[in-house]
Amino acid sequence: MTLAQLRYTIAIAKAGSMNEAAKSLYISQPSLSTAIRELEAETGVEIFRRTNRGIAVTPAGEEFLGYARQVVEQYELMEAKYISKEQSRKKFSVSMQHYTFAVNAFVELVKQFGMDEYEFAVHETKTHQVIEDVRNFKSEIGILYVNDFNRKVLTKMFHEYGLEFHELLNCRIYVYMWKGHSLAKREKITLEELKEYPCLSFEQGGNNSFYFAEEVLSTYEYKRLIKADDRATMLNLMVGLNGYTLCSGIICEDLNGSDYCAVKLDSDEIMTIGYVARKGVNISALGKKYLEEISRYKDKALK
C-alpha cells in the first residue's frame, strides 16, 4: 500500500468516475485501474463497485476512505511543516444536532483561539450525518442526545462504527415556543394541552427513523406535525403558526433572540446530551477546550 494509491482512491471517490479521476491525477486510466486493483487485492477490501453509471463506493470502501483521508492529511501536514516549511494551521471540526448552546460553545472557542493559526468548522446537521461525520473523520466530535428510547439502537451503531459516546449533560424536557403563544406563561404544559398546536421537528432526510429524531417523544401521535430543515425556519413557524418544539431547556438568547421561552413539559422523560468520538483516538487540545465550554452549560439547564 502506497501514499499514491491512497490519493488515487480519494480522487476516484470525489470524481465518481475512473476516467475523470485519471485526468485530474494526470495518469492514464489503465494505470489507475491497475493501481486500485492491486490495492484492493492487497487489503482484501472492495473499495469501489463498478456500475453502468460509473464508480460507487462500497460500505467497506467508505470506512477505508475515512482512514485514507486521515493518512493523506497527516502526511500533508508533515510535508508542510518539515519539507515545504510552511506554517500549517491547526484544525478543529465539530458536528452537532441543532443545539444553540453547542454553537455558542463553538463561538467562545473561536474567540479564545482566534483564526490566524487555527482553522475551524461547525456542522449543524441531521442525527445520522453527525455520526457519519465523526466516523469518516470529517469532525473530531459529534454532539447529540440519547434517552431510554433510542439508546440501544444508537449504542449498537456507535459500536459498529468504532465510536464511543460520552455523557455531558442530563436535561428534563421543555416546550420551546414564542412568548406570544397562549401557553407561554404557564409553569407546566401537558401534551394534551398542546395537541391543537403544530409540533415542529427537524427533518432527518433518508434516515427518518424515530430513533434518529432530534426531539424526544418522537413516537407520540401528534395531531399536527411540521418538519423543518433549519432553526431559522422553525423560529419563524413558532411565531407565524403558534408552533412549538421539544427541547433540553438550555436556552441561549444570544443566537435565538429574546422573543422565545421554554416551559416545562409534564413528563418524567430525561435526555442525556453528550458527544461521540472515535474509539481509542485522543481528543485534541481544541476538542478538550470545546468540551469544557459545553460543560459550562450544565448549570444553565432549566430545572
Residue ranges, per PLM feature:
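Short helix-boundary/capping micro-motifs
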Residues: 10-28
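A short LG(V/I)-centered, amphipathic sequence patch enriched
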Residues: 40-57
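Alpha-helical linker/hinge and terminal dimerization helices associated
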Residues: 42-43, 64-86, 93
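Central regulatory/effector-binding core of bacterial HTH transcription factors
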Residues: 89-152
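Secondary-structure junction motif
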Residues: 102-108, 147, 151, 184-219, ...
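Hydrophobic hinge/microswitch elements
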Residues: 135-140, 145, 204-261
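Flexible hinge/capping segments at coil-to-helix
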Residues: 157-199
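Beta-alpha-beta core module
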Residues: 160-166, 171-172, 232-281
